[in-house]
Swiss-Prot record:
Database matches in Gene3D superfamilies: MFS general substrate transporter like domains
Gene: entS
Organism: Escherichia coli O6:H1 (strain CFT073 / ATCC 700928 / UPEC)
Keyword Transmembrane helix set for record: yes
UniProt GO molecular function: enterobactin transmembrane transporter activity
Stretches in topological domain Periplasmic: 43-55, 105-109, 178, 240-256, 308-313, 378
Keywords from the named record: Cell inner membrane, Cell membrane, Membrane, Transmembrane, Transmembrane helix, Transport
Disulphide bond pairs: none
GO cellular component: plasma membrane
Residue spans crossing the bilayer: 22-42, 56-76, 84-104, 110-130, 157-177, 179-199, 219-239, 257-277, 288-307, 314-336, 357-377, 379-399
Protein name per the record: Enterobactin exporter EntS
Length: 416
């Protein structure tokens, strides 16, 4: 009997060329978006000196992404998915060019930043939805879990590298360089995506989009197991919105512009480690309990983050949050795929992604509001410990999720 490895199996990148192209495009895209993610809050903080305004930008972008995910789900089921992906990526690049040109003005427009955030959030989510819908055709349904873990690792590694580069660019060239390179990277992603095969939508009866979405909502509300997983995912994403406080906390810790990048890189770094060492997660006998406990630990890490006397200790707390949130997220993904009926998988995955975006937007708005009334340190701690209390209550209430057991799959030589 072969012992299951802790490490993630990357063989899909060798055996599936189309998935390899998506992997490359996604990595470049994440690096580009990371440059943007550092520049926007820092620019708004410098222009307004208001954490509320920083939170508002994240909230508006998150709202646009939510709408884009809903619209994108309909488009991906009715039109050729490769075309939807390419159109969405190219349109996003145009928005990044607009941010670059705005940053070069003597007096950049705050309204333009907000509007372009809406633009990019909407079109970016169109591409995400189409790519999610196309993934089974690219890798085969039997490889979806492995593809999901590789995708998480790609996103996290890119998110580690890009904030560090973004911080250095801020210290040397200003936000315009961040926006310009983000636009260039986005257009470069079109090259590997052009090699994808045609991805036509599956034949299906015509149904009003709202009716289909309502059926998905009803399933979530009726299933304490799947609904509980979705609720935990939303709360976990709310906690990650602590990044809107990074610029203000950086001032409190007297960090340089280059050091700010370490704050943005810490969570992705921890999550990358979590994804890379996720080989045994799918074999957990009680994944629901493990999901709940890892989520509670993540909330505790955020509560302690703002209390740290030195920024390097804060980075450690953020990395711990990233690792625990990766464990929880991978378990959420696995259980959603196995506990959701085949006919509901598309809608439930879309709604799960959308509620994560919504949780991020709500968390950003709440933290921005807290930042206007409290110190950044108090805001970060209040959010973390508040979510921890809610998490403990859910640990007691979500009985079916807590007690859920599964039979570990058989380990073969190819899995080791």
């Amino acid at each position: 009997m072969n012992k299951q490895s802790w490490l993630l199996n990357l063989s899909l990148l060798k055996t599936h060329p189309a998935f390899r192209a998506v992997f490359l495009a996604r990595f470049i895209s994440i690096v580009s978006l990371g440059l943007l993610g550092v520049a926007v809050p820092v620019q708004i903080q410098m222009m307004t000196h208001s954490t509320w305004q920083v939170g508002l930008s994240v909230t508006l972008t998150g709202g646009a992404m939510f709408v884009g995910l809903m619209v994108g789900g309909v488009l991906a089921d009715r039109y050729e998915r490769k075309k939807v992906i390419l159109l969405a990526r190219g349109t996003c690049g145009i928005g990044f060019i607009g941010l670059c040109l705005n940053a070069l003005l003597p007096e950049p427009s705050l309204l333009a930043i907000y509007l372009l955030g809406l633009w990019d959030g909407f079109f970016a989510s169109l591409g995400v939805t189409a790519l999610l819908a196309a993934t089974p055709a690219l890798v085969g349904r039997e490889n979806l879990m492995q593809a999901g873990a590789i995708t998480m690792l790609t996103v996290r590694l890119g998110s580690v590298i890009s904030p560090m580069i973004g911080g250095l660019l801020l210290a040397t060239g200003g936000v315009a360089w961040n926006y310009g390179l983000a636009a260039a990277g986005t257009f470069i992603t079109l090259l590997p995506l052009l090699s994808l095969p045609a991805l036509p939508p599956p034949p299906q009866p015509r149904e009003h989009p709202l009716k289909s979405l309502l059926a998905g909502f009803r399933f979530l509300l009726a299933s304490p197991l799947v609904g509980g997983i979705a609720l935990l995912g939303g709360l976990l994403t709310m906690a990650s919105a602590v990044r809107v406080l990074y610029p203000a906390l950086a001032d409190n810790w007297q960090m340089s512009a280059a050091q700010i990048g370490f704050l943005y890189a810490a969570i992705p770094l921890g999550a990358a480690i979590g994804a890379l060492t996720s080989g045994k997660l799918a074999h957990s006998v009680r994944p629901g309990l493990l999901m709940l406990l890892s989520t509670l630990g993540a909330f505790l890490a955020i509560g302690l983050f703002g209390l740290m006397p030195m920024w390097i200790l804060g980075v450690v707390c953020l990395a711990l949050f990233g690792w625990l949130s990766a464990v929880s997220s991978l378990l959420q993904y696995t259980m959603l795929q196995t506990q959701t009926p085949e006919a509901m998988l598309g809608r439930i995955n879309g709604l799960w992604t959308a509620q994560n975006v919504t949780g991020d937007a709500i968390g950003a708005a709440l933290l921005g509001g807290l930042g206007a009334m409290m110190t950044p340190v108090a805001s970060a701690s209040a959010s973390g410990f508040g979510l921890l209390i809610i998490g403990v209550l859910l640990l007691l209430v979500l009985v079916e999720l807590r007690r859920f057991r599964q039979t570990p799959p058989q380990v073969t030589a190819s899995d080791s």
